[in-house]
Design a protein with these regions (language model features):
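Conserved helix-turn-beta segment immediately C-terminal to the redox Cys motif
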Residues: 19-21, 38-57, 61
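Conserved Rossmann-like nucleotide-binding pocket used by diverse enzymes
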Residues: 2, 7, 27, 53-55
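A hydrophobic alpha-helical transmembrane-helix feature that marks the membrane cores
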Residues: 64-70
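Conserved redox-active cysteine motifs that mediate thiol-disulfide chemistry
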Residues: 26-40
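Non-catalytic, surface beta->alpha helical segment in thiol-disulfide oxidoreductase systems
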Residues: 73-106
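Residue-level signature of catalytic and energy-coupling elements of molecular machines
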Residues: 11, 24, 41, 58, ...
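Short pre-active-site segment immediately N-terminal to redox-active cysteine/selenocysteine motifs
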Residues: 19, 27-30, 73
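A short beta-strand-turn-helix
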Residues: 3-22
Length: 106
């Protein structure tokens, strides 16, 4: 599954109006833990076989979204369901914890 680049322009359509849960990854290219997390999220998306959208928000490019969600530390993961943020995690987490967070949001 390709990564979905989320911007201020497509946030409402891709996240708030999504018919499936969305896992957002707030990251930066220079962030070591963010780089470690990226393949984990890709793997999780593959395992969910289209039942989960995974979107990436570059906080350096999308400062408006970073401020809107009060991102003070990265990586930060937020799960959206039915247009609402239902779970949040800050820092690197193993795939099992992220999967549990997503499942808990269903």
């Amino acid at each position: 599954m390709a990564e979905l680049k989320i911007t201020a322009a497509n946030f409402e359509n891709e996240v708030l109006h999504s018919d499936k849960p969305v896992l957002l990854d707030f990251y930066a290219d220079w962030c070591g833990p963010c780089k470690m997390l990226s393949p984990v999220l890709h793997e999780l998306a593959e395992e969910k076989n289209g039942a989960l959208k995974v979107g990436k928000i570059n906080v350096d490019e999308q400062m408006e979204l970073a401020m809107r969600f009060q991102v003070s530390s990265i990586p930060m993961l937020v799960v959206f369901k039915d247009g609402k943020a239902v779970a949040k995690s800050v820092g690197y987490r193993p795939k099992s914890e992220i999967a549990a967070m997503v499942e808990g949001a269903r």
